[in-house]
């Protein structure tokens, strides 16, 4: 019987009526999720930061002791670095040399930057007034455990992936890609690899053009020839 042509508007209406919303999802690795659409709301698995830590390089001390004792020189009793905490409880007159991102040892609540301190052997003097909790980052300052990171239906971008990684999410649920089949019909069509055309033949333009047009991370393409 062959294929009967129909009016464009009727064809468009028929296609729209046959569309079924795509709800299937899949769980994929975080580093594969760029330009995918989240199928679930995603929350943080941890507090970020997980512990109170230093926002600067400098010296940590107890603000109350500093306020009550003018010109006090603190005894420096250790060093705290990111990933290498000082597991010691500091006394009131003690300080710790501390670096950005390092966990705050127990017994201190304030950080003075290096340039605001005078170090002499195992002593340090704080040059300027500092308020309690200055230059420290409290637990959960960036994200609290259970806080929203990505909404359902969000197109995931590179900053989203960074935020998801920081919040302890190694996998994400996303909608499966839309599937498109491309078929180019016509007895006169030949592939561009053919070097010599026969009478009546033309090179197939639509197929390679459409395959290229839809070649992206949003779609799964089926080449039907």
Question: What is each PLM-predicted segment?
Answer:
Residues 1-69, 122:
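Short, low-complexity N-terminal leaders and the immediately following helix N-cap/first helix
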Residues 2, 59-223:
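Short, glycine/charged-enriched hinge/interface segments at domain edges or termini
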């Amino acid at each position: 019987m062959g294929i009967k042509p129909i009016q464009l508007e009727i064809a468009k209406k028929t296609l729209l009526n046959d569309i079924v919303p795509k709800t299937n999802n899949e769980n994929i690795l975080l580093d594969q999720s760029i330009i995918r659409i989240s199928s679930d709301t995603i929350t943080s698995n941890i507090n970020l930061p997980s512990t109170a830590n230093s926002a600067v390089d400098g010296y940590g001390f107890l603000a109350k002791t500093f306020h009550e004792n003018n010109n006090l020189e603190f005894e420096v009793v250790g060093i705290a670095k990111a990933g290498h905490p000082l597991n010691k409880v500091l006394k009131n007159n003690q300080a710790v040399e501390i670096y950005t991102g390092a966990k705050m040892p127990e017994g201190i609540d304030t950080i003075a930057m290096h340039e605001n301190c005078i170090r002499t052997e195992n002593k340090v003097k704080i040059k300027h007034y500092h308020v309690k909790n200055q230059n420290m980052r409290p637990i959960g300052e960036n994200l609290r455990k259970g806080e929203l990171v990505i909404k359902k239906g969000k197109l995931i971008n590179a900053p989203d992936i960074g935020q998801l990684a920081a919040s302890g999410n190694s996998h994400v649920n996303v909608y499966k890609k839309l599937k498109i089949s491309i078929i180019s019909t016509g007895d006169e069509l030949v592939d561009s690899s053919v070097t010599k055309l026969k009478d009546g033949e033309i090179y197939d333009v639509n197929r390679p053009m459409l395959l290229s047009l839809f070649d992206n991370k949003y779609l799964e393409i089926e080449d039907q020839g």
